[in-house]
Amino acid sequence: MRNRWKTGVILASAAAFTVFAFAQTARPKPDVAHGKLVFDDNCADCHYRDSKDEKVGPGLEGIKNGTLPSGRKATHDRILDIVNNGPAEMTSFQNRLTEQEKEDVVAYVMTL
């Protein structure tokens, strides 16, 4: 009886973990064209897309070559973290954009 109970708990825990793990890894498929619109509406006031010159924030030209204006490696997760949390002087877009909009703008920024 005790072994059945332990087996049931282990199986239920494994099933819950599997469902949670798959739910956490699913990202919306990015739409670069929509990301350009999101950028125009939310980012273009502070960032040039076609220059490395500073506006309010740094210009973003050249990110497609793999480097952020800070000199750090340009990765999806790093750019998403900047969108969500930004440096201290940048507005956070964590609660201003949907997950889809964030994925779209990250995909677009990675083409600059």
Model-derived regions, located:
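Post-cleavage N-terminal segment of exported redox proteins
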Residues: 1-31, 82, 109-112
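Axial heme c-ligation environment in periplasmic c-type cytochrome domains
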Residues: 54-65, 82-112
